[in-house]
């Protein structure tokens, strides 16, 4: 389950997380991103003890999207100890996404 939080520094938030952080880079106008929302809820619930899910609206935070070279939406990036360790682009099925993430948690 994604939690709405304010943060002053994205990198500090990632580095300070005790769990790996799955970042969903999305936009409100993106149809495939809207398809991913319930899938991410399901994955977040299934892996809630192992990962934290964060959503970043690329229209509101273009500098973060540029920093991580986000060129297509949705893009999911798994960060561990502040560093990107896995990247997925496009709509993912819940079972496949869980299987991919479990390798890193």
From Swiss-Prot:
Disulfide bonds: 30-33
Pfam families tied to this protein: Thioredoxin
UniProt-recorded Gene Ontology molecular function terms: protein-disulfide reductase activity
GO cellular component terms listed in the entry, alphabetical order: cytoplasm; cytosol
Keywords noted in UniProt: Disulfide bond, Electron transport, Redox-active center, Transport
A biological-process GO annotation: cell redox homeostasis
UniProt keyword annotation of Isomerase present: no
Record CDD domains: TRX_family (cd02947)
InterPro entries attached to this UniProt entry: Thioredoxin, Thioredoxin-like_sf, Thioredoxin_CS, Thioredoxin_domain
Domain Thioredoxin residues, every copy: 1-102
NCBIfam families: thioredoxin (TIGR01068)
Protein family membership: Belongs to the thioredoxin family.
Record's protein name: Thioredoxin-like protein slr0233
Species the sequence originates in: Synechocystis sp. (strain ATCC 27184 / PCC 6803 / Kazusa)
């Amino acid at each position: 389950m994604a939690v709405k939080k304010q943060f002053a520094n994205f990198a500090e938030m990632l580095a300070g997380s005790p769990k790996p952080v799955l970042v969903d880079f999305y936009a409100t106008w993106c149809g495939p991103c809207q398809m991913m929302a319930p899938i991410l809820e399901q994955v977040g619930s299934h892996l809630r003890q192992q990962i934290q899910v964060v959503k970043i609206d690329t229209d509101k935070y273009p500098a973060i999207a540029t920093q991580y070279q986000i060129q297509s939406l949705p893009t999911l990036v798994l960060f561990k100890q502040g560093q990107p360790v896995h990247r997925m682009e496009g709509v993912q099925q819940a079972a496949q996404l869980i299987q991919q993430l479990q390798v890193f948690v």
